Amino acid sequence: MARVKRGVTTHARHKKILKLAKGYRGRSSTCFRVAIQKVEKALRYAYRDRRAKKRNFRALWIQRINAGSRAYGLPYSRFMDGLKKAGIALDRKVLSDIAIREPDAFKSLVEKAQAALQ
């Protein structure tokens, strides 16, 4: 049986890691042992922050809706309750977009929510 030399696969693996580490400062982009640590840490941060991004955007949308609905005298929680009772099924992303870009349409939504709460 022939001897298997692993130079090709090792070189390819090192090249892959160093390509991912491109743009890092100092030895982090040139030295494999340092680069692999930095790349693994960066991938962990990326994984964590993809999940955090969803939470952050939801919180931002809620703040925008709250600000918009309070401008017309209705707090966020009562506004959302009124929308649900009125049968208006818009998600928070769309509601926040309407609150910013189309205040007149948002005002009519607030009025419908208030009417449904009565």
From Swiss-Prot:
Biological processes per GO annotation: ribosomal large subunit assembly; translation
Presence of keyword Acyltransferase: no
Domain of life: Bacteria
Annotated Gene Ontology cellular component terms: ribonucleoprotein complex; ribosome
CDD domains, alphabetized: Ribosomal_L20
InterPro entries tied to this protein: Ribosomal_bL20, RIBOSOMAL_L20_CS, Ribosomal_protein_bL20_C
Any GO MF annotation of the entry: structural constituent of ribosome
PROSITE patterns: RIBOSOMAL_L20
Pfam families attached to this UniProt entry: Ribosomal_L20
Key words of the record: Ribonucleoprotein, Ribosomal protein, RNA-binding, rRNA-binding
Protein family membership: Belongs to the bacterial ribosomal protein bL20 family.
Function field: Binds directly to 23S ribosomal RNA and is necessary for the in vitro assembly process of the 50S ribosomal subunit. It is not involved in the protein synthesizing functions of that subunit.
NCBIfam families associated with the record: rplT_bact
PANTHER family: 39S RIBOSOMAL PROTEIN L20
Entries under HAMAP family matching the protein: Ribosomal_bL20 (MF_00382)
Protein name (record): Large ribosomal subunit protein bL20
Native source species: Paramagnetospirillum magneticum (strain ATCC 700264 / AMB-1) (Magnetospirillum magneticum)
